[in-house]
Amino acid sequence: MPEPLTPSAQKVQDALAAQGFSYQVVESPTPSRTAAEAARLVGCQVAQIAKSLVFRMKQSGRPVLVIASGANQVNEWRIGALLKEPLEKAPAAFVREHTGFAIGGVAPLGHPKPLDTFIDQDLLKLQEIWAAAGTPNALFRLVPGDLAKMTGGRVVKVT
């Protein structure tokens, strides 16, 4: 019988089920705090890791979630231009407050309130991707097209 999931990973599993997705969260004893570590852990390419990055809008203070390919660096200016407001990197406490997760484990869903979300168009070129699931030790595999369905996010160029 598999080990029970930690509370944060279970929260993501429950959010997946609530939205009708049958994806399974898996946890490892080894944490993966970077896209490269996560890719090694699950045996995929770095580009297949969907990293969830949280930014704060400079004037309004609203959170913004960018789900990017692990191979890409997010161009904050580009996303800010889409929002018509500059962005800044969000501090750890802000990330936890608005997502319910610590940096390194931010999942694309399961947040206390919906976030403005942007999805890297490069992820949709892949057959399967992996996303964080609540902790640095938890991930789930999914079809890239489901990201927009589960997050309500806009697919854009993020680089």
What does each of the following model-derived ranges do?
Residues 1-159:
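Extended, low-hydrophobicity, polar/charged segments
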